[in-house]
UniProtKB/Swiss-Prot annotation:
It comes from Tyrannophasma gladiator (Gladiator). It is found in: Secreted. GO terms for cellular component: extracellular region. FMRFamides and FMRFamide-like peptides are neuropeptides. GO terms for biological process: neuropeptide signaling pathway. Its main location: secreted. This is Extended FMRFamide-10. Keywords: Neuropeptide, Secreted. Belongs to the FARP (FMRF amide related peptide) family.
Length: 11
């Protein structure tokens, strides 16, 4: 998800 670490990995 996008809300994981602060960067877009898999929105």
């Amino acid at each position: 998800p996008a809300s994981d670490s602060g960067f877009l990995r898999d929105p």
